[in-house]
Amino acid sequence: MKFYSSHPMPESLAAAIAVPLLGLLPAAQAASTAVQLPSVTVEGEYSSYQPESAQSPKFTAPLADTPRTVQVIPERLIQDQGASDLEAVLRNAPGISMTAGEGGRPASDLPFIRGQNSASSLFVDGLRDPSTQSRDTFNLEQVDVVKGPDSVFSGRGGAGGSINLVTKTPRNQDFTEVQAGIGTAETYRGTIDGNWVLGENTALRLNLLGTRDTVPGRDKAVEFSRVGIAPSLRLGLSGPTRVTLGLYHYRHRRVPDYSIPYDPRTGTPITETIGVSRRNFYGLVRRDSGDTEDYAATVKWEHDLANGFKVENLARYSRATVEQITTMPELKTADLAKGLVYRNLRASYQVNDSFANRTDLRGTFDTGQWRHTFDLGGEFATSRRSRDRYKQEIPDAASPCSPVTDGNNPALCASLRDPDPHVDFPGTVRRNHNPARYHTDILSLYGFDTIAFDEQWQLNLGLRWDHYKTSGRNLPVRGAKPPVYERAARTDNLFNYQLGLVYKPRPDGSVYASYGTASTPSAVSDYAPADSISGTSQQLKPERSEAIEIGTKWQVLDRRLLVTGAMFRETRKNTSIEVAEGLRAPAGKSRVTGMELGVAGSLTPRWDVYGGYALLDSKLVRASHKSGAQGQPLPSAPRHAFSIWSTYKLLPELTVGAGAFYRSKVYGNADAGYNKDGTPKARWVPAYWRFDAMAAYQLNKHLTAQLNVYNLLDKTYYAKTYRSHYAALGPGRSAMLTFKLSY
């Protein structure tokens, strides 16, 4: 998109004032109009590090005029960083932490946004994605992150915000890009992105993926492979009616890794306390396995109506299967004294079938002197989920790490300092074939309107109603014959809204205040994307969240650079806590107060930058009657988080870049109490810095070589925390050389 400015700025001057601009000084911007200079028009392109808008039609204003924190992570940034999965992409979004899963889900994307669990708030092209997977980037065009309660956009859940993955679709031009990469740690990756125009109004796009990796800094037994294919066909490229058909298949096979156990004496990982090697892998190669497979079919229909109105309908069916048998390293104080780690089995088999359909009508109209930009829509979604357990049978397996056996069963009891993941596994692991089953239906209606009263004042409104109905039967009671199932059901009507006021002192700047809400039904799971319900949770009313945010956004340096800042307070109420022995009630409460700063775009035509900082002052205001968590920080809510990435074009053919990422101390749980043996209940990981770098050289018109180096200082850090048993190590230092062939 082209832009026009009457205030050009020399390249040297822009670089000199870059740092003060990051301080968000709109007053200085206003003062610059005191002297009248001859008007000169400068024409250029927005930086590809500064996306203009989010993908969803529910956003009825550009990002610079949207009265809340919305961060868009663009495709070029993902490519420059060599980010191959969603976890790496979200490293660019301060305020988001990934947590480790349980119940056989260590390899899935489980984000926390501003200290609130957002595992159920992941979307693909605006439709909720209930699958349990570690997502690859081979078919991503951008990632949109909404921060703060956003049920008005995303529906049920959304207490901390939501994440929308925007996929690649056909374009009106021919191109093919083939990438082949080889890296340290036996890493191989290949992708193909091709687009072909077929006739006047049809285009085909095809994205392919193949990768095989081990994990840098971990035992070579920890390996995985991914394959993916995503074809899409668009009919009516330039006509008033457009239809896009898309398919998606993705498979992720791996040896699962629960990483490093906590030291029960301190609550920190044993790599920090007794100096065990970060390469230690406590799993069993001959028992453990993980296999995730996802299918999706999408149909999008768009039609241009009169007066600039547009209508679109998006429908998608998806099926996700997860089979995971893994080791959770369990370390107790008595085992620690003997130098033993219990190889505790964690396994599950899950199948999730879902269908969603969304229809939107959007456009612009005037009422007197007021300009309305609106979106009206409705959505229906249904999902069915099953979850089964496994049973392990091993001769003489009782108390494998007790003094009775003295750790003589190495299949279940590993050496703390020198575990052998290749020992024989003498037993069997079989699925029970008595799954829990859940069924959820949601009907939604919503409306959004941005009202421009004049060139300076805008009002942003949003309203949503969700009819939420869920039912299910839980896993059978252990040992009961015949099987005894607990059945439960609940129906809720959820109303959510947002209100935002925007003042634009200049066309390239805005100041805003906003209020928004979210509703989280009791069946929304903390550690899974899909819903589940129990006899206890069916009695509980939905949690409520609300947020107040004030902020400012400025497009500076001839609109090449977007600089943002915001302060907020978010409150979550009605969380389920134990108020008396055996009695739960929606009486819990938590609060997060904080601020965010962001920068995205170009300092000069050669110098791009993307970064941000988040301060989260979180507190569990009201907790369980016997918990030591009250008054403590929330889990997965680091007080400080910072990221910065920058590239510079040294020569027309050569681009170099580097990035820094910081996260302060993070808790896996919020409990400040002590166990009966005097050991702390709290689990936490220390702060860390991580540094990455890249260089790309265009060898000729069609071929480019790019080198990425990750974790330059080979820092031992922890990318994910879990509330009780373990923390997941981040990868060690590695490098990847990728050749890109484009034509």
From Swiss-Prot:
Lipid bilayer topology: Multi-pass membrane protein
InterPro entries per the UniProt record, alphabetical: Plug_dom, Plug_dom_sf, TonB-dep_rcpt-like, TonB-dep_rcpt_b-brl, TonB_rcpt_b-brl_sf, TonB_sidphr_rcpt
Record-annotated TBDR beta-barrel domain positions: 173-743
CDD domains in alphabetical order: ligand_gated_channel
Short motif TonB C-terminal box, span: 726-743
TBDR plug domain ranges (all copies): 62-168
SUPFAM superfamilies from the UniProt entry: Porins
Superkingdom classification of source: Bacteria
GO cellular component term, pick one: cell outer membrane
Cellular localisation: Cell outer membrane
Signal peptide limits: 1-30
Keywords: Cell outer membrane, Ion transport, Iron, Iron transport, Membrane, Receptor, Signal, TonB box, Transmembrane, Transmembrane beta strand, Transport, Virulence
One function term, GO molecular function aspect: signaling receptor activity
Pfam families membership: Plug (PF07715), TonB_dep_Rec_b-barrel (PF00593)
PANTHER family: BLR3904 PROTEIN, FERRICHROME IRON RECEPTOR-RELATED
Protein task: Probably involved in iron transport.
UniProt-listed NCBIfam families: TonB-siderophor
Sequence similarity: Belongs to the TonB-dependent receptor family.
Protein known as: Probable TonB-dependent receptor BfrD
Species assigned in the record: Bordetella pertussis (strain Tohama I / ATCC BAA-589 / NCTC 13251)
